[in-house]
Amino acid sequence: EFLAYAEELRPYIADTGVVLDEIFSEGKNVLFEGAQATFLDIDHGTYPYVTSSNPTAGNASTGSGIGPRYIDHVVGVVKAYTTRVGEGPFVTELLDTDGPGHQIRETGHEYGTVTGRPRRCGWLDAFMLKYSARLNSLDCLAVTRLDILDKMPKIKMCVGYKIDGQEIKQIPASLNVLAKVEPVFEEFEGWLTDITSIRTFDELPVQAKTYLNRLSEVAGVELGIV
């Protein structure tokens, strides 16, 4: 019975690496899209609170069967705020039940697609983003869900970490140390207007542009898509 199924599937199965190599030899481009997030990476994430694979950019090569030299542009996709599913460290998490954390969750419908479990929400951690930019060799950022912050009068962004009152330069490798860090926040004025119909960066309110430009500055990566 199952061998019959195999014959039905045979025309759709091939060595992906070979297929992609032929496409590249024709001068065509291929877009690879990853899932999950850098800090869920089994090698570079917040182990043991990780997934079982490598969601980082390098897996575009190992997962597809192409050589790493074929990858010549990497776009980092990041929400305008930070979320996490399940357990694990979350430096900028908002634990309120009726404040900005709740507002982000409800406005952004931040609930698990399959389980319906509420996602943990917090202010954007640009310090983590800086680590991710280095690890993934990001060329630019694609910032999503900026409109979820439309009704926020004040917006915060984490631009660094402190331990015992002293700022640190890198994210600690030890979860025990990471649990002790305090976020260094910068506060921004909200734009308090609906931006969902805006289609160019220049049309954005000045407050939104200020927020995005600071995000780019801290991460060390230019904005590519908003």
What name fits each language-model region?
Residues 1-226:
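Non-transmembrane, aqueous-exposed alpha-helical and coiled segments at domain scale
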